[in-house]
């Protein structure tokens, strides 16, 4: 705990894939200052994605200064700082100079595909799944780190001599903000590295050996809510969580069975499973989230590949809407989709199907189908895919979802939110505060330093702007969903495997 009596603000740093943001909250969790800066995306080869870690730190530092200036407050009035970040993105730097030895390898980057294939050939897939809760995929940090050590001249030797440090973006920012004094991460970020045992809560020696990672490179792993150190200007750094886990906490989904969906380009669904690390039978990830005091809780995570991107396709490729916001109007003009289903398997299907060979399709077309029906079917597809993942989660953990909390750009679409409630048969709650990812980091930091007294105080601040209650009867709901499942089956295994 620190003395926060005269300090009435918390800063959340939200370090994302395309931009760095700083958001300042007051004691009522109102936003009083914001700043955002984009940074460059580097694509050195097809399927490769990199960021410059120095540019990430520079943009993040600048947004802090700008947000403070906008709010008209000084560092001395800030009780603590919380960090939420793009997960899995990997940085390796020289601990003496603070200079990266290579660009950050971003979560989207697929360069370590062959490393993952070799891990599977060597029979490590089941051990990785059991230990980390993750699938053997280039998405996660461990194989990215191995690639850097294997491909940057002298990196492996220097790492073994203890000269290099590894971190995800949270670790990198804290190391820079503290002037190289603190090398730390939290459990949520560690759980995304493919090197962390989510049951023992330790770096896993066998996985480090398999990947050839020197243990001395790795940060200390701590809870998501505690004081880790101080910035050079004296602000306590007191909260860390990966972006999706931070949104889960910002939505106050801290009890088992509570879930949130972030509707972005894709959709990220997380369900809190409490102290049970539930192993999925449906290809969902088992990951670490934040409990009521920022301690370790477990969650199931599933991703829908094409959510908001389906609406972008209507706008940019088909050109049947001028603005994503117009889709609500057109979808509401017709009483139903007239039997049309759009399956947006543009890049295959994610959870729970995991079919990279599926391709998108429109079904149920007749001469009576209008553009409005197709627009409606596109929005409905986002809700159907969300149900696919939530049904899998409920089957895995044996818990019934009481309500779904929502955030992200598409939640402004009232038609989509109502149809989501209808097809789930569950209330959908849209919060007044849309900045739930940054809010989660602020809450974690504020709890650690005594800025907020506890969960009850935070729950009082979680104002639901609108609740969407299901309006379809059970027969209608299941008939519509059966049509969706039939449509999905017709898209499966479409692409030739050799293609």
Curated annotation (Swiss-Prot):
EC number: 2.7.1.30
Gene Ontology CC entries for this record: cytosol
Key words of the record: ATP-binding, Glycerol metabolism, Kinase, Nucleotide-binding, Transferase
Top-level class of the enzyme under EC nomenclature: transferase
Record-listed ADP binding positions: 17, 21, 265, 308, 409, 413
Regulation: Inhibited by fructose 1,6-bisphosphate (FBP).
GO molecular function: ATP binding; glycerol kinase activity
Biological or metabolic pathway of the protein: Polyol metabolism; glycerol degradation via glycerol kinase pathway; sn-glycerol 3-phosphate from glycerol: step 1/1
Entry keyword annotation includes Coiled coil: no
Name the record gives this protein: Glycerol kinase
NCBIfam families, alphabetized: glycerol_kin, PRK00047.1
Binding site for ATP: 17-19, 265, 308, 312, 409
Catalyzed reactions per annotation: glycerol + ATP = sn-glycerol 3-phosphate + ADP + H(+)
One BP term from GO: glycerol metabolic process
């Amino acid at each position: 705990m620190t003395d926060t009596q005269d300090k009435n603000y918390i800063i959340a740093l939200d370090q994302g894939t395309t931009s760095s943001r700083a958001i300042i909250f007051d004691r009522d969790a109102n936003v009083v200052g914001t700043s955002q800066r984009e940074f460059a995306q580097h694509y050195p080869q097809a399927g490769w994605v990199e960021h410059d870690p120095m540019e990430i730190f520079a943009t993040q530092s600048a947004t802090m200064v700008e947000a403070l200036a906008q709010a008209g407050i000084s560092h001395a009035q800030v009780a603590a700082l919380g960090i939420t970040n793009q997960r899995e993105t990997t940085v390796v730097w020289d601990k003496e100079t603070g200079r990266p030895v290579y660009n950050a390898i971003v979560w989207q980057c697929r360069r370590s595909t062959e490393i993952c294939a070799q891990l599977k050939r060597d029979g490590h897939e089941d051990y990785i799944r059991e230990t980390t809760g993750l699938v053997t995929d280039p998405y996660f940090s461990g194989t990215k780190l191995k690639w850097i050590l294997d491909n940057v001249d002298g990196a492996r030797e220097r790492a073994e001599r203890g000269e290099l440090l590894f971190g995800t973006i949270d670790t990198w920012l804290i190391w820079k903000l503290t002037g190289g004094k603190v090398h730390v991460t939290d459990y949520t970020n560690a759980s995304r590295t493919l090197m962390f045992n989510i049951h023992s809560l330790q770096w896993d020696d066998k996985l480090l050996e398999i990947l050839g990672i020197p243990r001395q490179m790795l940060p200390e792993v701590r809870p998501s809510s505690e004081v880790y150190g101080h910035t050079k200007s004296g602000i306590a750094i007191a909260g860390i969580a990966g972006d999706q886990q931070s949104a889960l906490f910002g939505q106050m989904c801290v009890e088992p069975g509570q879930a949130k969906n972030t509707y972005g380009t894709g959709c990220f669904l997380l369900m809190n499973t409490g102290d049970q690390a539930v192993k999925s039978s449906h290809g969902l990830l088992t990951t670490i989230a934040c409990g009521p005091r920022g301690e370790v809780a477990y969650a199931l995570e599933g991703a829908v590949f094409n959510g908001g991107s389906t609406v972008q396709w209507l706008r940019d490729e088909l050109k049947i809407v001028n603005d994503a916001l117009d889709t609500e109007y057109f979808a509401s003009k017709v009483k139903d989709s007239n039997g049309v289903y759009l399956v947006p398997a543009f890049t295959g299907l994610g959870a729970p199907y995991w079919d990279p060979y599926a391709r998108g399709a429109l079904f149920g077309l007749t001469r009576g189908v209008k553009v409005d029906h197709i627009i409606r079917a596109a929005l409905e597809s986002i809700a159907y895919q969300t149900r696919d993942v939530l049904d899998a989660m409920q089957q895995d953990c044996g818990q019934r979802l009481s309500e779904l909390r929502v955030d992200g750009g598409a939640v402004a679409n009232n038609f989509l939110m109502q149809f989501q409630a209808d097809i789930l048969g569950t209330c959908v709650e849209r919060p007044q505060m849309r900045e739930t990812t940054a809010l989660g980091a602020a809450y974690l930091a504020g709890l650690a330093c005594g800025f907020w007294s506890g969960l009850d105080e935070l729950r009082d601040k979680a104002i639901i702007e609108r609740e969407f209650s299901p309006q379809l009867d059970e027969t209608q709901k299941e008939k519509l969903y059966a049509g969706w499942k039939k449509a999905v089956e017709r898209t499966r295994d479409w692409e030739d495997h050799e293609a």
